[in-house]
Amino acid sequence: MNILLTGGGTGGHLAIAKALMESLASKNQSLFFIGSQRGQDRSWFEHEEGFKRRFFLETQGVVNQRGIAKIRSLSSQFQAMLEARKILKNHQIKRVVSVGGYSAAPASLAALSLGIPLYIHEQNAKVGLLNRLLKPFSRAFLSSYDSNSLIRDYPVRDAFFEVARVRSRVKKILFLGGSQGAKAINDWALELAPLIHQRGIAIMHQCGEVDYERMKRGYEERSIPVELFAFDRAIHQKMQQADLAISRAGASSLWELGANGLPALFIPYPFAAGDHQYYNAKFILDQGLGWMVRQENLSTEVLLEILEEDLSQKSECLMAYVKRGAADRMADFILS
């Protein structure tokens, strides 16, 4: 069957697309992808052999635009939708699966206009505008936060489960700023570094490409040993080494940490659309599976309290809560 995956913009959306691609490819399906020329879509999938064809259309986000910029964004989305219609027809696509993000709009709307079944995965606890609009017209709407969802497990790649382990005491901390880094987390890491080092705890830090040189100087000036990196696609290998993560609350990071059994202190990005990272972290907090602090409330005391805890119960509960095989269950559902 010819199936098209669409969506992206950020690593969170694209991680879901990759997990679904791997599962559907293992079931001998012919896969196609439509993303955007902007964002990270091209860097993730331009050379991805799991897709038979990959298309990157000229689109940009609409939600945060105003005035003329919003009109231009809507116009680019409409033109891209017309291109997507041609792609779907030319390649006889039978299913379209959206993983969200502004780059999902053209192919999703094209699918509905052509009567092709549309499946939507919502990665966040707070439903995005596009998915909210398309949900009533979709064949199925899947969400890990929705009690009415037919599949509630989050599609995390097997690699994160394969290196999972139970943590107890903190010997190494991993700072995670998401696929693009986070200046607030970077700054807090430098503030905490002397205290962490004094306690004999090792530091790993994913700081993003833009802030890499500044962070490198910052650790050197403090004479703090650190494993510093801008970004790593094999982030599961970094997680496996850590005992505690300090992270943004993007959905994929949140569930990947859970699959790995790695307890985390979440610092939601305060300017995320609809404050969705706060609601993502709150969902985990409400299950008793992690910690959360608002960016404006960061303090040394927050970390000190966690360092005194035995993490084994949270770690074990995370591993039990996040189920393996969600991508396969979603793939089977889409093919049924």
Swiss-Prot record:
SUPFAM superfamilies xref list: UDP-Glycosyltransferase/glycogen phosphorylase (SSF53756)
Known catalytic reactions: di-trans,octa-cis-undecaprenyl diphospho-N-acetyl-alpha-D-muramoyl-L-alanyl-D-glutamyl-meso-2,6-diaminopimeloyl-D-alanyl-D-alanine + UDP-N-acetyl-alpha-D-glucosamine = di-trans,octa-cis-undecaprenyl diphospho-[N-acetyl-alpha-D-glucosaminyl-(1->4)]-N-acetyl-alpha-D-muramoyl-L-alanyl-D-glutamyl-meso-2,6-diaminopimeloyl-D-alanyl-D-alanine + UDP + H(+)
Keywords attached to this entry: Cell cycle, Cell division, Cell inner membrane, Cell membrane, Cell shape, Cell wall biogenesis/degradation, Glycosyltransferase, Membrane, Peptidoglycan synthesis, Transferase
Pathway: Cell wall biogenesis; peptidoglycan biosynthesis
Signal peptide: none
Binding site for UDP-N-acetyl-alpha-D-glucosamine: T10, G11, G12, N124, R157, S179, Q277
One GO term of the biological process aspect: cell division
Keyword presence, NADP: no
Membrane-protein topology: Peripheral membrane protein
Class of the enzyme per the UniProt entry, highest EC level: transferase
UniProt-annotated location(s): Cell inner membrane
EC number(s) reported in the record: 2.4.1.227
Name of this protein: UDP-N-acetylglucosamine--N-acetylmuramyl-(pentapeptide) pyrophosphoryl-undecaprenol N-acetylglucosamine transferase
Function: Cell wall formation. Catalyzes the transfer of a GlcNAc subunit on undecaprenyl-pyrophosphoryl-MurNAc-pentapeptide (lipid intermediate I) to form undecaprenyl-pyrophosphoryl-MurNAc-(pentapeptide)GlcNAc (lipid intermediate II).
A GO CC term attached to the entry: plasma membrane
GO MF annotation list: UDP-N-acetyl-D-glucosamine:N-acetylmuramoyl-L-alanyl-D-glutamyl-meso-2,6-diaminopimelyl-D-alanyl-D-alanine-diphosphoundecaprenol 4-beta-N-acetylglucosaminlytransferase activity; undecaprenyldiphospho-muramoylpentapeptide beta-N-acetylglucosaminyltransferase activity
